[in-house]
Amino acid sequence: MPKKVFCGTVTKAKCDKTVKVSVLQVYKDELYKKVIKKYKKYTAHDENNSCKEGDKVLIQEHKPISTTKKWVIVNSSH
């Protein structure tokens, strides 16, 4: 089974080797015919501490690193 990959924005980068990434998910409600935007936050592992707040990053599913970290940063574009 392929690993999930999401594109998001770094919202918090204060901890060591850890960043909080906000991912936008857009879907259409079939009943009300309305487009809904939903943000979900993921805790991701940043090995080199290279990400800053506001950076666009690609995160990929990974085996659990800690209690809440189950994602790893694959690509960071500044």
UniProtKB/Swiss-Prot annotation:
- GO-annotated molecular function: rRNA binding; structural constituent of ribosome
Q: Where is the signal peptide?
A: none
**A cellular component term, taken from the record's GO annotations:** cytosolic small ribosomal subunit
Entry keywords, A to Z = Ribonucleoprotein, Ribosomal protein, RNA-binding, rRNA-binding
Record carries keyword Nuclease: no
Tree of life domain? Bacteria
Q: Name one GO biological process term.
A: translation
Q: How does it assemble?
A: Part of the 30S ribosomal subunit.
What's the stated role of this polypeptide?
A: One of the primary rRNA binding proteins, it binds specifically to the 5'-end of 16S ribosomal RNA.
Family assignment from sequence similarity:
Belongs to the universal ribosomal protein uS17 family.
Name used for this protein in its record: Small ribosomal subunit protein uS17
Say which species the protein is native to: Wolbachia sp. subsp. Drosophila simulans (strain wRi)
